[in-house]
UniProtKB/Swiss-Prot annotation:
Annotated catalysed reactions: 2-(N(omega)-L-arginino)succinate = fumarate + L-arginine
Organism: Yersinia pseudotuberculosis serotype IB (strain PB1/+)
Entry keywords, A to Z: Amino-acid biosynthesis, Arginine biosynthesis, Cytoplasm, Lyase
Name of protein: Argininosuccinate lyase
GO biological process, one term: L-arginine biosynthetic process
Length: 457
């Protein structure tokens, strides 16, 4: 039975009902709807709509219903109820009779669904923060185990300067720290309760909304009823958080896909996160990483879709807002799954140190060290930069590394170059010099790992 049938003389066309109903996806708000209903029943006692005995009956019935939902949430989908609010109310009436019909007094589905969704978002943020931290922990442990794994760092996908695999891992720890910070910021803004705002103008009952917000675990109550029932900023913010987070995971995946390729061959991925080819028996494909990269697009699409849904809506509630859930549910589930999968990829990854070092020694990644050497000898940096460029051209012509050039070859570009240049051009020297905070020197990387462990474990 619909919650709004008295005004209508004809039943809804079945095609419209299927188009209009939202139970198939908003059933996921069942627990939140029941929790909100328990709090609302307490509020109705304070204004004399319910007495204490009636409230206890309702709360007990709702508690039983909550247990049933937790045991088998998908059983809800067997109902032909319009939405989760209708389903909960119908089940409550089945349990307590006409008393259940009193619960919706002073409440609208507009403030009800806004409350349900915020409660769900709060729980989901906690889950996401946990998953972010678990991936950070996996990255830190991988970094700690690979502090001595020297590899090329890249700009423009060209070998640039030597780094370590540990330093690479720690870069993603920083990105994930920003993801967690954004989630925390989102939580602060959504932690206000819209319950008691009615359809748009506020409830006609003198309910203490601050007390009601406290019962539900919100920091406070919202300040304007029109805004409260139409606000979906938290949906946009969470979708934005997810979109940025998925961009980070997509970059992580792309890096490892390249590192795992035959062209780089820096890492081996575990058999547990790879698959084969139906035709080519030699293949070991990085499917987990490719799916992480691929799923980034659907999350970006959810953000774009929700932005377009909201952009032209007048105050206050409009049915368009029913479209706020499917994209949000899918995007946050996708982000959560990808966070877990990224951590699984790191569990069992093998860094191929000899190959990494070999690649770091190629591509003239120590050219900047030669420029710095010249600067230390009194050559202006811009001039030193030009000199080293010429030296690299000569090394390429001879098919040698910079450090393999004879001293006489180097001195044709600058007379200040002496025998002391060769230790400077050594791979380890390139790392050791990066001692400023955030640099790739062994001591800085070790310090960053220690700081991250203290913060995350």
């Amino acid at each position: 039975m619909a919650l709004w049938g008295g005004r209508f003389s004809q039943a809804a066309d079945q095609r419209f009902k299927q188009f209009n109903d939202s139970l198939r996806f908003d059933y996921r708000l069942a627990e939140q709807d029941i929790i909100g209903s328990v709090a609302w029943s307490k509020a109705l006692v304070t204004v004399g709509v319910l007495n204490a005995d009636e409230q206890q009956q309702l709360e007990q019935a709702l508690s039983v219903l909550l247990e049933e939902v937790q045991a088998n949430p998908h059983a809800i989908l067997a109902s032909d109820a319009e939405d989760i609010h209708s389903w909960v109310e119908t089940k409550l009436i089945d349990k307590v009779g006409d008393l259940g019909k009193k619960l919706h007094t002073g409440r609208s589905r507009n403030d009800q669904v806004a409350t349900d969704l915020k409660l769900w978002c709060k729980f989901q943020i906690t889950e996401l923060q946990t998953a972010v931290q678990q991936l950070q922990q996996a990255l830190v442990m991988t970094a700690e185990a690979n502090q001595d794994a020297v590899m090329p760092g890249y700009t423009h996908l060209q070998r640039a300067q030597p780094v370590t695999f540990a330093h690479w891992c720690l870069a993603y720890v920083e990105m994930l720290s920003r993801d967690e910070s954004r989630l925390q910021d989102t939580l602060k803004r959504l932690d206000v309760s819209p319950l008691g705002c009615g359809a748009l103008a506020g409830t006609a009952y003198a309910i203490d909304r601050e007390q009601l917000a406290g019962w539900l675990g919100f920091a406070s109550a919202t300040r304007n009823s029109l805004d409260s029932v139409s606000d979906r900023d938290h949906v946009l913010e969470l979708l934005s958080d997810a979109s940025i987070g998925m961009v980070h995971l997509s970059r992580f995946a792309e890096d490892l896909i390249f590192f795992n390729s035959g062209e780089a061959a820096f890492v081996d991925l575990s058999d547990r996160v790879t698959s084969g080819s139906s035709l080519m028996p030699q293949k070991k494909n990085p499917d987990a990483l490719e799916l992480i990269r691929g799923k980034c697009g659907r999350v970006q699409g959810a953000l774009t879709g929700m932005t377009m849904t909201l952009k032209g809506l007048p105050l206050a509630y409009n049915k368009d807002m029913q479209e706020d859930k499917e994209g949000l549910f899918d995007a946050l589930n996708t982000w959560l799954d990808c966070l877990h999968m990224a951590a699984l990829v790191l569990d069992g990854i093998q860094v191929k140190r000899p190959r990494c070092k070999e690649a770091a020694e190629q591509g003239y990644a120590n050219a900047t060290e030669l420029a710095d050497y010249l600067v230390a000898k009194g050559v202006p940096f811009r001039e030193a930069h030009h000199i080293v460029g010429e030296a690299v051209v000569e090394a390429i012509r001879q098919g040698k590394a910079l450090e393999a050039l004879a001293l006489s070859d180097l001195q044709q570009f600058s007379s200040v170059i002496g025998d002391d240049v060769y230790p400077i051009l050594a791979l380890q020297s390139c790392l050791d010099k990066r001692v400023a905070k955030g640099g790739v020197s062994p001591q800085q990387v070790a310090s960053a790992i220690a700081e991250a462990k203290a913060r995350l474990f």
